[in-house]
Amino acid sequence: MLGTGITERLEENPLRKELIHHPFFKEVRSSAELDREKVGIFLGQWWHPLHYFPNFLSRTIDQLDMLEMKTAIGKILYQELGEGDPARAHERIYVTTMQEAGFDEATVAQAAPLEETRRLVQRYREASADRLSALGFVYGTEVADLAMVAGIGNAVRRVSGLKDLPWVDIHILQEPDHVAQVNEAIEPDFSAEEIDIIVANAEEMWSLWTNFFNRLRKVMFGTEELPAAAAA
């Protein structure tokens, strides 16, 4: 299990708190400006890290030496890919859920990435080339994921009127297990220096997501126009 010291460092980290309490989430809960077009922008940008995440996990497994760590991350990957049923894969449920909410597939899964989105996915890819950075990025994602998913749920419910969103529901069901698996994936005998590297990479992950939401907030609720390529 993850040692108490590193758990506290990660859970209480100000960069994590900055992300999960990002003002963007308040905007999607209460802004009178929120409309279907704005939510479509949000969905189209979220697709890119969602789509790449299984690749990231599989590359992370390749970097791990301990079987226990491979198994822990492998369970997350198994759930992400539908537990043997492609129809239950997270990205498939994402598209079908949003289609049921009235968004077409082009809006949800074919929008060009904004620069912050592109950089986010790029760093997932680069981090997965090293064991410690990969673990930091996994943890950085999993301990903040529910707050971000809740933001999507709030936005989609407000503009669609739907209450049941299967993609949100599966995250609520599986995310506690994902966090537990990440905890199991941290070796109990990591050195202090290795722990510092894991934490530093989790911090970078949170900063990348914060930049992602900073840009979305400008595009959706500020004065910045969506680039033509991302609007296509």
Q: At which residue positions do the language-model features occur?
A:
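Non-heme di-metal
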Residues: 1-232
